[in-house]
């Protein structure tokens, strides 16, 4: 099963990549594809909408935080 999950990047300031990753992998493990970017400090978000919709159509489940980010961006699924 695939999940859309946040993967932490950045050492001192939290910056996250939104990735499609196998549910059995670690948070920092190998991802299937990078589908977005989230910076909570500067409140910036970049989403690759076609890639996100592709994974959602294939049955991927977003985590709670990713679900909130997608809802805020207006992605309907």
Curated annotation (Swiss-Prot):
Name of a matching Pfam family: Ribosomal_S16
Gene3D superfamilies: 3.30.1320.10
GO cellular component: chloroplast; mitochondrion; small ribosomal subunit
Main location: plastid
Matches recorded under InterPro entries: Ribosomal_bS16, Ribosomal_bS16_CS, Ribosomal_bS16_dom_sf
GO biological process, one term: mitochondrial translation
MF terms in GO: structural constituent of ribosome
Subcellular location(s) per record: Plastid, Chloroplast
Alphabetically ordered keywords of this record: Chloroplast, Plastid, Ribonucleoprotein, Ribosomal protein
Record-stated family: Belongs to the bacterial ribosomal protein bS16 family.
Record NCBIfam families: S16 (TIGR00002)
Protein name: Small ribosomal subunit protein bS16c
Species annotation: Eucalyptus globulus subsp. globulus
């Amino acid at each position: 099963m695939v999940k859309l999950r946040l993967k932490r990047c950045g050492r001192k300031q939290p910056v996250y990549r939104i990735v499609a990753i196998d549910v059995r992998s670690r948070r920092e493990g190998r991802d299937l594809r990078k589908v977005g970017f989230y910076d909570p400090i500067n409140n910036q978000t970049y989403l690759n909408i076609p890639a996100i919709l592709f994974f959602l159509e294939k049955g991927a489940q977003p985590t709670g935080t990713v679900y909130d980010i997608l809802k805020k961006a207006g992605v309907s699924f």
